[in-house]
């Protein structure tokens, strides 16, 4: 009789034992499966140098970005080798979420006010469902408040506006090497002559070569399609070579460039100085990140 009871109890508990084993195997399977791991810090700043990078502020973070360009180095002692002349741009840029950033700023050249939205729908990742690149989309609008030389000109506000659209595609090939392609479309509502195109296309390429945990060499070049057709002074493709220094929440960039302008319609379509002629400017960027809204720790 006791043997029969033991047999019945064993048979009754057998499905429960099998179910527990299945649950344990399922938990182990989830732990063993590779996870999708995002690749961070393709660039250390939201800019390569002039151009926006694929990076954006994390949700709740605010960046103060200051960009400055001096005059021509070869201007001589009379203009103190470019220090007497300068252009600058100051902006505030906020992370709405980890994939959406907005920003607004003011540039001294042509007295531009600008605002932009940057969206990062695709992020480079490793592991399960790995992605080879990070893709960010940028839309920017700007308007000039400058006075035109002829007081008789009546320039409506719509004609003072310019726009820029960019598809930023970057890959971090190694901890010390990152590259970015930046197809760019620029539209200017008002141009110098009817022969000048309102809309122009440019292709940018940029890179970052890391030397130490806090220093890197950066480079950026833009090829402007049909620049030879623009009237006025000859245009040159902007080339910029810089050196980055990271100090905690600050990133400091110092560089040489043939472009005096800072916003896209300026440095891409209006660069009239050449590296071959040694017409170079010293510039620097400073970014400072503040955490405005702290994220809640997930339990």
Where does each model-flagged region fall?
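Transmembrane beta-barrel domains of Gram-negative outer membranes and organellar outer membranes
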Residues: 21-154, 161-165, 170-181, 185-189, ...
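Cleavable N-terminal signal peptides
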Residues: 7-8, 18-19
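Intrinsically disordered, low-complexity regulatory regions of eukaryotic regulatory proteins
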Residues: 20-21, 218
